[in-house]
């Protein structure tokens, strides 16, 4: 039985089974306070940064899985159960959960007692709000125990030094509010570290701040010893293992519904906590928070909507893909069920790609994020790899051959969305001092690549390109990336256009000449006969060739030969035919074929430690699939493009593999799916935070549906199979709302007219 259903009118996925193969997550956030929560109530909250201001424990990779979280125990006579289903052994008789846009809701019933718990981070205050409604079929007295297992805010410090540092923590009660003070020596940014508070709008009959008192020795969240006592111990904690637990007694009459709210929040001082709680306890606070949340998402989604005969694709394009994309834009690749949130800040490469997809939906946010990325560029044009704007730590300074070129693509598409190049005159600082206009920044991106070319004429790999595992081909500094040459060519085309519009014909000609050089190399030296080679090692060996014993064909150089236009038309078609022949599976396109052993190309300089079919070594790397979809659209092969897109839709991939094999969420994209050379073929891995989200959105909206900005207006250039026609699209562009009906794959330009607010057109 399918354990879920989509309810698109509410933008929700509703689950009927709590013990799905892995935790299926949702993200809650107001931009400052954040949380992720599973379908069983497990999860973690953090203030601004999960590295230095993590609020509660979440035990990654441990058993039982998905612990701890945000739990509300209901004690009804001798029975103790949770609306979240977990962690109690005593289960509800009826249960379902729903993940929505910025909230998660649980509905459960046991012995005539119905409970509905809604979790959200309020957009009005820095508080994670737990709203609980109880309805009884008879008179009864119940006690509600909300519980959070607190941890040290610095996760890595806790792993290493908790035996000392936990005795520098304080959790105490003041005026009915539990307050957690994190005051550890040498902590980063102590003046910005908030107090965390826990309270309810129902008077508490007891509380605990000491985890040992509430949970008990050799106990777990499944059966806390505190629930066996008449009352909690009112324990405070000045050193030890902290928690928040409240005891909230309620009397319910037959047929009566009572609601209560629990507040897990942050403020800088006790007085600010009091003010915040006064606002939170207003009768309409929950309703107002939900309404503001709904309004913000309605505005977000209004920039692009579509209607398609394929309702799975429509569900992803209209709701879950842009929702996931926004979460990537907000959190980069920092913390998820798979990523511990301990070492990655904001990746320049990662976030620059997120910006591309955000431009049509939230233009100002996209510009702001792009300008933040520019601060990580050096005067010579290269960029830091990732950085820590909240934590203030030193950035990771590895020089990759691709990072700075993504900035060119961002700048181009921002200018294109506006229809002019004036934005490029905006000043932006360099990381190593001084400043320049955005135009000067991206010109330096081009200069850096031209000054770092290899012996064969392709860009040097440097620390690696987009495919991080290729760092081993360039340890001596001579390895070259054929793929980066293709990315460079895409950037050069964009720069040529921008230069012409800025009145710099000499630079435009320079870009044109550089492009021609890469094109000539690609059509000769990079061409292997049936596909394009991938890279060149320090010793001059071509990786990605029929003559090689392993990893003969790589996906990215085939798709980007089309995206860049470097290959001849015949080469482009042949390369993508080879993708279909050697790399395509019913669960997506493999990254390479065949997978490598751990002694290729040599035992000393092996390219991978991954098992065959896993990760970089022959999995379906979903991010890279997106470029193949775009390439097939550019070649005007809609059947291939749609196959590659449709088979990767998470609900379709899960159905193909089977829910127990696929494991991950059926409503968001994953980074990779184990390939056919693995005995776990079909296992989805690293969901939510992946560049797949941004590029699947771009592939669907700008290439399959074909609605793309141009300098002169909105271009409609769809590439859809016949069974998907007619399709309808709403796109807001330069202040005008376009209502477009697509009846055939025909190219059409809708010129922009200043002042026009709406246009309805049929293609």
Language-model segment annotations:
Residues 147, 164, 384-385, 487-604, ...:
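Catalytic cores of carbohydrate-active enzymes
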Residues 1-350, 364-372, 413-417, 501, ...:
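Anionic coordination/interaction segments
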Residues 75, 346-351, 355-458, 481-489, ...:
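Aromatic-rich carbohydrate-recognition surfaces in CAZymes
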Residues 102-105, 124-125, 152, 438, ...:
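Hydrophobic, small-residue-rich alpha-helical packing segments that form membrane-like cores
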Residues 544-581, 622-625, 629-635, 644, ...:
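Aromatic (Trp/Tyr) and acidic
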Residues 135-140, 270-274, 417-431, 492-512, ...:
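Inter-helical turn/loop segments and adjacent helix faces that build the functional surface
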Residues 336-345, 384-403, 431-433, 437, ...:
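Carbohydrate-binding/catalytic loop surfaces
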Residues 709-742:
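Surface beta-strand/loop "capping" patches
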């Amino acid at each position: 039985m399918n354990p879920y259903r989509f309810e698109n009118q509410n933008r929700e996925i509703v689950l009927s089974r709590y013990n799905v193969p892995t935790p299926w997550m949702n993200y809650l956030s107001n931009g400052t306070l954040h949380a992720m929560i599973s379908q069983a109530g497990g999860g973690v909250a953090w203030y601004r940064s999960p590295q230095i201001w993590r609020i509660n424990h979440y035990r990654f990779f441990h058993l039982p899985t998905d612990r701890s979280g945000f739990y509300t125990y209901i004690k009804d006579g001798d029975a103790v159960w949770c609306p979240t289903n977990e962690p109690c052994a005593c289960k509800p008789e009826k249960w379902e959960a729903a993940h929505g846009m910025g909230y998660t809701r649980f509905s459960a019933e046991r012995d005539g007692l119905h409970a509905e718990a809604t979790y959200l981070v309020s957009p009005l205050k820095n508080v994670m709000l737990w709203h609980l409604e109880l309805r009884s079929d008879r008179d009864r007295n119940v006690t509600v125990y909300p519980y959070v297992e607190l941890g040290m805010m610095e996760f890595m410090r806790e792993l290493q030094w908790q035996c000392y540092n936990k005795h520098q923590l304080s959790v105490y009660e003041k005026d009915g509010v539990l307050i957690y003070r994190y005051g550890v020596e040498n902590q980063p940014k102590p003046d910005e570290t908030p107090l965390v508070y826990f309270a309810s709008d129902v008077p508490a009959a007891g509380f605990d701040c000491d985890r040992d008192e509430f949970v008990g020795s050799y106990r777990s969240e499944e059966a806390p010893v505190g629930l066996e006592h008449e009352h909690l111990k009112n324990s405070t904690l000045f050193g030890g293992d902290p928690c928040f637990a409240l005891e909230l007694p309620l009397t319910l009459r037959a047929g009566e519904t009572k609601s209560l709210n629990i507040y897990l929040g942050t403020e800088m001082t006790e007085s600010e906590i009091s003010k915040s709680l006064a606002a939170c306890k207003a009768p309409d606070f929950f309703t107002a928070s939900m309404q503001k949340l709904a309004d913000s998402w309605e505005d977000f989604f209004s920039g692009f909507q579509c209607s398609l005969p394929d309702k799975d694709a429509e569900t992803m394009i209209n709701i879950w893909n842009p929702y996931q994309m926004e979460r990537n834009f907000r959190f980069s690749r920092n913390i998820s069920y798979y990523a511990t949130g301990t070492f990655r800040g904001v990746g320049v490469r990662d976030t620059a790609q997120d910006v591309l997809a955000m431009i049509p939906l939230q233009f100002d946010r996209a510009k702001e994020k792009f300008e933040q990325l520019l601060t990580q560029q050096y005067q010579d044009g290269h960029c830091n790899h990732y950085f820590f704007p909240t934590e203030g730590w030193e950035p990771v300074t590895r020089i990759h051959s691709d990072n700075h070129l993504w900035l060119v693509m961002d700048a181009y598409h921002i200018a294109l969305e506006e229809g002019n190049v004036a934005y490029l005159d905006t000043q932006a600082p360099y990381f190593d001092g001084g400043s320049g206009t955005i135009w000067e920044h991206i010109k330096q991106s081009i200069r850096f690549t031209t000054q770092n070319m290899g012996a064969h004429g392709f860009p040097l790999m440097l620390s690696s390109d987009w495919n991080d595992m290729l760092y081993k081909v360039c340890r001596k500094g001579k390895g070259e990336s054929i793929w980066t040459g293709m990315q460079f060519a895409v950037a050069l085309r964009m720069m040529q256009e921008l230069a012409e519009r800025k009145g710099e014909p000499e630079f435009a000609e320079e870009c044109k000449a550089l492009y021609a050089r890469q094109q000539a190399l690609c059509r000769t030296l990079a061409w292997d006969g049936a596909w394009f080679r991938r890279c060149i090692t320090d010793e001059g060996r071509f990786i990605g060739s029929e003559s090689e014993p392993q990893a003969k064909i790589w996906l990215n150089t085939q798709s980007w030969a089309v995206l860049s236009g470097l290959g001849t038309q015949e080469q482009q078609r042949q390369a993508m035919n080879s993708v279909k022949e050697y790399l395509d599976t019913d669960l997506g396109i493999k990254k390479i074929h065949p997978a490598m052993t751990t002694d290729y190309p040599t035992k000393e300089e092996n390219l991978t430690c991954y098992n065959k079919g896993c990760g970089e070594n022959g999995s379906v790397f979903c991010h890279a699939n997106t470029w193949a979809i775009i390439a097939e659209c550019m070649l005007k092969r809609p059947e291939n493009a749609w196959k590659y897109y449709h088979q990767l839709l998470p609900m379709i991939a899960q159905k193909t593999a089977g829910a127990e094999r696929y494991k991950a969420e059926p409503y968001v994209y994953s980074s990779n799916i184990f390939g056919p050379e693995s005995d776990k073929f079909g296992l989805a891995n690293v969901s939510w935070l992946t560049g797949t989200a941004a590029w699947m959105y771009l592939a669907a909206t700008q290439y399959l549906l074909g609605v793309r900005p141009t300098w002169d207006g909105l271009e409609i250039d769809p590439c859809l199979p016949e069974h998907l026609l007619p399709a309808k699209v709403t796109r807001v562009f330069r202040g005008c709302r376009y209502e477009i009906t697509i009846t055939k794959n025909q190219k059409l330009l809708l010129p922009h007219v200043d002042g026009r607010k709406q246009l309805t057109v049929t293609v």
